[in-house]
């Protein structure tokens, strides 16, 4: 509904900012990273915006960059991740760091974030890896993390191990999942591997 708000920064705290636009003060929840990037109080600035609509409330979320807003919205697509947890991820890590953790299949990098456990980290990686890769410009540092297909099988095995499956079982299931379509995406391979194990 809203792309961004431009106005005078009235106040800025670690978790929220107030922006005055045409005489109306809007309260935004922000990540720690956005709070650090905002200018001095009284200065005109822009906050890229996401509006969360619930039955009992409307809440604005503000972001210093379009990239952070985009990642926030992607995180909301992950099963079990709501606005509060998505904002916690962005407060705990910079956008490029989250991208790299997802593409490198490194859930341990997400564990230190408040509210992100082993299974949540695994779901974030499983459900967002292909989406993040599509957004990365060809030749960028982010894209290069996932460019090596040699580590693709190991990424899938590690993701299943993160979900609690033993390595031999995960390795065999990934092998079966790759047989019909060796170039399938990581998300597809893991879903097929999970289906294989559940059907046994």
Swiss-Prot record:
Residues 144-154 are annotated as: Flexible linker. Residues 65-143 are annotated as: Domain II. Its main location: cytoplasm. Signal peptide: none annotated. It holds the Pfam family RuvA_N. Residues 1-64 are annotated as: Domain I. The keyword rRNA-binding does not apply. GO terms for biological process: DNA recombination; DNA repair. Keywords: Cytoplasm, DNA damage, DNA recombination, DNA repair, DNA-binding. It is found in: Cytoplasm. It comes from the Bacteria. GO terms for cellular component: cytoplasm; Holliday junction helicase complex; Holliday junction resolvase complex. Residues 154-200 are annotated as: Domain III. GO terms for molecular function: ATP binding; four-way junction DNA binding; four-way junction helicase activity. Has three domains with a flexible linker between the domains II and III and assumes an 'L' shape. Domain III is highly mobile and contacts RuvB. Belongs to the RuvA family. Homotetramer. Forms an RuvA(8)-RuvB(12)-Holliday junction (HJ) complex. HJ DNA is sandwiched between 2 RuvA tetramers; dsDNA enters through RuvA and exits via RuvB. An RuvB hexamer assembles on each DNA strand where it exits the tetramer. Each RuvB hexamer is contacted by two RuvA subunits (via domain III) on 2 adjacent RuvB subunits; this complex drives branch migration. In the full resolvosome a probable DNA-RuvA(4)-RuvB(12)-RuvC(2) complex forms which resolves the HJ. The RuvA-RuvB-RuvC complex processes Holliday junction (HJ) DNA during genetic recombination and DNA repair, while the RuvA-RuvB complex plays an important role in the rescue of blocked DNA replication forks via replication fork reversal (RFR). RuvA specifically binds to HJ cruciform DNA, conferring on it an open structure. The RuvB hexamer acts as an ATP-dependent pump, pulling dsDNA into and through the RuvAB complex. HJ branch migration allows RuvC to scan DNA until it finds its consensus sequence, where it cleaves and resolves the cruciform DNA. This is Holliday junction branch migration complex subunit RuvA. It comes from Chlorobium phaeovibrioides (strain DSM 265 / 1930) (Prosthecochloris vibrioformis (strain DSM 265)). The gene is ruvA.
């Amino acid at each position: 509904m809203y792309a961004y708000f431009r106005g005078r920064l009235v106040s800025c705290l670690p978790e929220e900012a107030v922006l005055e636009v045409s005489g109306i003060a809007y309260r935004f929840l922000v990540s720690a990273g956005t709070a650090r990037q905002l200018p001095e109080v009284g200065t005109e600035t822009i906050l890229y915006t996401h509006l969360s609509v619930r039955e009992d409330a409307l809440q604005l979320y503000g972001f210093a960059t379009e990239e952070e807003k985009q990642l926030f919205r992607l995180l909301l697509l992950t099963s079990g991740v709501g606005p509060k947890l998505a904002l916690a991820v962005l407060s705990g890590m910079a956008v490029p760091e989250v991208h790299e953790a997802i593409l490198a299949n490194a859930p341990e990098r997400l564990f230190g974030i408040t509210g992100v456990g082993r299974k949540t980290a695994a779901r974030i990686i499983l459900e967002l890896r292909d989406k993040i890769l599509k957004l990365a410009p060809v030749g960028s540092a982010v894209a290069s993390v996932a460019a090596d297909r040699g580590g693709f099988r190991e990424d899938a095995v590690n993701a299943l191990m993160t979900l609690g499956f033993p390595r031999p079982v995960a390795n065999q299931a990934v092998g079966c999942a790759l047989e019909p379509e060796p170039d399938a995406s990581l998300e597809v391979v893991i879903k097929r591997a999970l289906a294989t194990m559940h059907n046994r």
